[in-house]
Curated annotation (Swiss-Prot):
Protein name as catalogued: S-adenosylmethionine synthase
Chain positions recorded as K(+) binding sites: E43
Subunit-level organization: Homotetramer.
Cofactor: Mn(2+); Mg(2+); Co(2+); K(+)
Recorded metabolic or biological pathway in which this protein acts: Amino-acid biosynthesis; S-adenosyl-L-methionine biosynthesis; S-adenosyl-L-methionine from L-methionine: step 1/1
Subcellular location(s) per record: Cytoplasm
Source organism of the structure: Litchi chinensis
InterPro entries noted in UniProt: ADOMET_SYNTHASE_CS, S-AdoMet_synt_C, S-AdoMet_synt_central, S-AdoMet_synt_N, S-AdoMet_synthetase, S-AdoMet_synthetase_sfam
Length: 393
């Protein structure tokens, strides 16, 4: 049996780039909660002792941007300079303007147009991916890397590993074989964790705690063997972290946000963007399409692409590839997809209820992945049953 290695990485919520994603989406949530028609393009950057929010926002909402920044940083765990940022005393800079009237007139008309008439907020192409290798219909390498990051945060916040600090990165290499186009995991080849820690803990304590409290609860035993390699804080020291260690910027972790390097990516980031931005809404609808294809048994693995022109409601193209795992030809799967999914941006917002704010809805997406999550707010993860002729197949 010929196998290959594939690696996916993740970062947890204290990573500077992810801090910025969370601030941007917290701003989006606040705007949508008061005004579902808010037009939001919110970027965030951070460095030592400073967080800045900037961009274009047109909303009727009354939003305290500085308070959102401080609350978000505090909830992550940035409560002192020692851990990388002091949420209550850092500098907060705000430079928010209204959306360009050129873009607004060419795209939205959202107060007068019907949802099906609303044009795309920009050009671009987005990809959705699904695979039957995990219950989430997501790649195993990505799922494990993401869950390790989430577990790091959990044991930090609940006090199990009190020496942990907010910043951290994970990476998992999985050995696969290709089963006629379907990806079949064989074993976990390598686990890498680099996590920020306090001054008191030893490297041996770090390694022991990570194996016991992070790796063991996350990675199923069947994937681990005596040959599995563990790199646990291999640099030897990671005390300085968060924005004090590295600058951060919204939209710098787009592969972590999606499929861990599997499938494809059109390049557009998600966080801080309202649903008229097809970078986000387009990626959500093609994930639902790909997931529904696999869940309905049409294919074991597939990718769906959609593309748009600014101001035009109808997509320019829709593409499906089942990697040879389809039970029926890809052209037939594409026909089913077009019959069951409405790719017009206004209708995506309606069908996935994307204008609904509150409950930290989009903030939740900004760490630990936008896909493969069991949460009623992740409406794009709801499988749409697809009818097809199994006898003919």
């Amino acid at each position: 049996m010929e196998t290959f290695l594939f690696t996916s990485e993740s970062v947890n919520e204290g990573h500077p780039d992810k801090l910025c994603d969370q601030v941007s989406d917290a701003v989006l949530d606040a705007c949508l909660a008061q005004d579902p028609d808010s037009k939001v393009a919110c970027e965030t950057c951070t460095r030592t002792n400073m967080v800045m929010v900037f961009g274009e926002i047109t909303t009727k909402a009354n939003v305290d941007y500085e308070q959102i920044v401080r609350d978000t940083c505090r909830s992550i765990g940035f409560t002192s300079d020692d851990v990388g940022l002091d949420a209550d005393n850092c500098k907060v800079l705000v430079n928010i303007e209204q959306q360009s009237p050129d873009i607004a007139q060419g795209v939205h008309g959202h107060l007068t147009k019907k949802p099906e008439e609303i044009g795309a907020g920009d050009q671009g192409h987005m990809f959705g991916y699904a695979t039957d290798e995990t219950p989430e219909l997501m790649p195993l390498s990505h799922v494990l890397a993401t869950k390790l990051g989430a577990r790091l945060t959990e044991v930090r916040k609940n006090g199990t590993c009190a020496w942990l600090r907010p910043d951290g990165k994970t990476q998992v290499t999985v050995e696969y074989y290709n089963g006629n186009g379907a990806m079949v995991p064989v074993r976990v080849h390598t686990v890498l964790i680099s996590t920020q820690h306090d001054e008191t803990v030893t490297n041996d304590e770090i390694a022991a705690d990570l194996k016991q409290h992070v790796i063991k609860p996350v990675i199923p035993e069947k994937y681990l063997d005596e040959k599995t390699i563990f790199h646990l804080n291999p640099s030897g020291r990671f005390v300085i972290g968060g924005p004090h260690g590295d600058a951060g910027l919204t939209g710098r972790k787009i592969i972590i946000d999606t499929y861990g390097g599997w499938g494809a990516h059109g390049g557009g980031a998600f966080s801080g963007k309202d649903p008229t931005k097809v970078d986000r809404s387009g990626a959500y609808i093609v994930r639902q399409a790909a997931k529904s294809i696999v869940a309905s048994g049409l294919a074991r693995r597939c990718i769906v692409q959609v593309s748009y022109a600014i101001g035009v409601p109808e997509p320019l193209s829709v593409f499906v590839d089942s990697y040879g795992t389809g039970k029926i030809p890809d052209r037939e799967i594409l026909k089913i997809v077009k019959e069951n999914f409405d790719f017009r941006p206004g209708m995506i917002s309606v069908n996935l209820d994307l204008k609904r704010g509150g409950n930290g809805r989009f903030l939740k997406t900004a760490a630990y992945g936008h896909f493969g999550r069991e949460d009623p707010d992740f409406t794009w993860e709801v499988v749409k049953p697809l009818k097809w002729d199994k006898v003919q197949a």
